[in-house]
Amino acid sequence: WSGETLEDLRLVWYNYIDPDKTVEICNYLKAHADSVFLDIYTESEKQDDPQKRNTGLFFFRGNPGAPFAVCNAGGAFAYVGAMHDSFPHALELSKLGYNAFALIYRPDDAYEDLARAITYIHDHADELGVSASGYSLWGGSAGARMAAVLGNANYLYQLTGREDIPQTSAVIMQYTGYNTVSPQDAATYACVGTSDGIASWRTMQRRLQSLSALGIPTEFHAYNGLPHGFGLGTGMVAEGWIKDAVRFWEENR
């Protein structure tokens, strides 16, 4: 990343970072500093692996008892681009009444961390004030791969070791080249730009067509001219896609 001020923030592989949204997020985090971050690993686990100290969930609260979403930023498994690729999504979902969590994961152990995050929320649902059923997994780029993998019923069991955790109701994914298809995949909403030089819109479209052929609900959007990493797409042709994704989630809950 680069930039000396919030207005100048730049993240590798991302476009259209909105300074106003960045400021809004920082103000939200400051206002909720005492309760916004949740540790998902125990103190003993963090002592054994110090990197786990920087791993956890930022909680953007919605309505009590509402379903939850876990948002996973991309960053090519080199870093976590949360300020543009998960915090804005989580904040907007909370404004719509949903309980949203943005995961800060270890790039080398991303799938393990997402599995732990889902387990943590499931086991602490009452304490957190969220519904443990009907949840969704969101992600952009590398984060979309994470959402797709943990959205698969078989991988969910393999990575959590738990049979009591339900499969996600929907996977909401942006701009990724993930192309694995399985009958155990969840309902999937995908969006991408036609000028994405990293994740081909055709690859995403073909995957969703294959899922549809298996009887899995899908919805696909390719936005003309948009590059990789457009986030919420504020002021762009993709603006408002997040509400379409929420509708898809609700239809499959």
Model region roles, listed by residue range:
Residues W1-P64, A153:
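N-terminal cap/lid segment of alpha/beta-hydrolase-fold proteins
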Residues A66-G75:
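Short beta-strand element of the alpha/beta-hydrolase
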Residues G81-D85, F101-V130, G233-A238:
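Catalytic nucleophile-loop/oxyanion-hole region of alpha/beta-hydrolase
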Residues A82-F101, Q209:
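Short amphipathic alpha-helix adjacent to the substrate-entry channel of hydrolases
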Residues E112, R116-D185:
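Primarily recognizes the serine-hydrolase "nucleophile elbow" in alpha/beta-hydrolase
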Residues Q184, A190-V192, D196:
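Short beta-strand/loop motif that positions the catalytic acidic residue
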Residues G197-R206:
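Conserved alpha/beta-hydrolase "acid-adjacent" motif
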Residues L214-R253:
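C-terminal catalytic histidine-bearing segment of alpha/beta-hydrolase fold enzymes
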